[in-house]
Structure formats: structure tokens, C-alpha cells
């Protein structure tokens, strides 16, 4: 399957796994916003530390604005392969197109490391 129009870079599996774990940790010890509407609000306010977007969103237009908005606000974002992975890591029993870490809690070190690696990927 071809990459969706909103996927701006390939996320290595190891980095995707690290982001999934950071999202789980932030869900347990910090604050996580779930769902595209909430994520959009936190990006617009500049309060998101890291945005996680699923690669399998259909229709793609649901999340197509998120990378553009995040770049505009200089907020890092990363992709996970499925909505179920994003939803599960965010503490949901269903999939979600996107989530964001607002307060990293115990995942602060991991988030900083992920942000560095994302910057390298986007170069």
C-alpha cells in the first residue's frame, strides 16, 4: 500500500516502538490528548510536546492538516503504523487517528530523545 499523503517521512520501527512506549508512559504519569480534534486544539495552543499520528487513517483528510499545523507551530510529530497502536498507547480500547503528549510525566527523557531523532529524520 502506498504511503498516505500526510506521511512526510518514514519512521523506523525502533523509533515507532519508542514513541509508542513514551505515549503509554505519558498516559500513566502525565497528560495525553486523544483524538484529532483534541490534538488539533493542543497544537494550535502550542501545548503539545509530541504528536503521534496513525499511518492508516482513511480518509486521509481527517489528519492531513496535522503535520502542516505542527510544522507551523514547530511541534514534533511521528507516525505509528495503525490507529489501534495509537489508541492502545493512549489508553483507549479503540483506535484513534492521532494523540499528543501534553505533559510527558515520567517519559520526559524519552520524548526529548524522540524529538532529536525526528529532527534528524526530517533533514
Swiss-Prot record:
Disulfide bonds: none annotated. One of its GO terms (biological process) is translation. Keywords: Cytoplasm, Ribonucleoprotein, Ribosomal protein, RNA-binding, rRNA-binding, tRNA processing. Gene3D superfamilies: 3.30.1330.30. GO terms for cellular component: cytoplasm; ribonucleoprotein complex; ribosome. InterPro entries: eL8/uL1-like, Ribosomal_eL30-like_sf, Ribosomal_eL8/eL30/eS12/Gad45, Ribosomal_eL8/Nhp2, Ribosomal_eL8_arc. One of its GO terms (molecular function) is rRNA binding. It is found in: Cytoplasm. Its main location: cytoplasm. It holds the Pfam family Ribosomal_L7Ae. PANTHER family: RIBOSOMAL PROTEIN L7AE FAMILY MEMBER (PTHR23105). Multifunctional RNA-binding protein that recognizes the K-turn motif in ribosomal RNA, the RNA component of RNase P, box H/ACA, box C/D and box C'/D' sRNAs. Belongs to the eukaryotic ribosomal protein eL8 family. Part of the 50S ribosomal subunit. Probably part of the RNase P complex. This is Large ribosomal subunit protein eL8. The lineage of its organism: Archaea, Methanobacteriati, Methanobacteriota, Methanomada group, Methanobacteria.
Amino acid at each position: 500500500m502506498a504511503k498516505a499523503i500526510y506521511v512526510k517521512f518514514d519512521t523506523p520501527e525502533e523509533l515507532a516502538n519508542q514513541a509508542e512506549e513514551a505515549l503509554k508512559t505519558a498516559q500513566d504519569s502525565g497528560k495525553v490528548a486523544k483524538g484529532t480534534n483534541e490534538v488539533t486544539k493542543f497544537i494550535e495552543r502550542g501545548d503539545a510536546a509530541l504528536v503521534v499520528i496513525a499511518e492508516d487513517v482513511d480518509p486521509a483528510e481527517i489528519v492531513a492538516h496535522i503535520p502542516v499545523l505542527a510544522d507551523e507551530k514547530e511541534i514534533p510529530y511521528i507516525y505509528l503504523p495503525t490507529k489501534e497502536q495509537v489508541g492502545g498507547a493512549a489508553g483507549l480500547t479503540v483506535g484513534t487517528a492521532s494523540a499528543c503528549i501534553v505533559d510527558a510525566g515520567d517519559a520526559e527523557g524519552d520524548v526529548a530523545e524522540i524529538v532529536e531523532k525526528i529532527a534528524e529524520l526530517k533533514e
